[in-house]
A protein has these predicted regions:
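Acidic, Ser/Thr- and proline-rich intrinsically disordered linker/docking segments
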Residues: 2-3, 9-13, 23, 29, ...
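His/acidic/aromatic-lined binding-pocket segments of jelly-roll/cupin-type domains
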Residues: 19-21
Length: 88
């Protein structure tokens, strides 16, 4: 299980929020304490992941069966590696 704190998330609807990510064996849990919000992204719903630079941070773009999610964080490659390890 890998955790990533202070991640800026933008979903397919254009909604942005500050979240914590937790990668488990079957899903990525996305939690925003400030907005009292939690989301679960099943790893089976992931189609592709891509990483690019956004200033001094990494921009991780995830294509899912339900749309696109973008995460901005300092260590994007570690997030992608954790997702790939969990997917097997």
């Amino acid at each position: 299980m890998a955790r990533f704190q202070r991640v800026k998330e933008t979903d397919g609807d254009g909604t942005s929020r500050l979240v914590s990510l937790e990668v488990t064996d079957d899903a990525v849990y996305r939690t925003s304490k400030a907005q009292m919000w939690e989301g679960r992204l099943p790893l089976a719903a992931l189609i592709s992941t891509n990483i690019s630079r956004d200033g001094s941070s990494d921009l991780v773009t995830v294509e899912t069966k339900h749309g696109q999610i973008q995460w901005v964080l300092k260590n994007g490659q570690s997030l992608i590696d954790a997702i790939e390890r969990s997917r097997g």
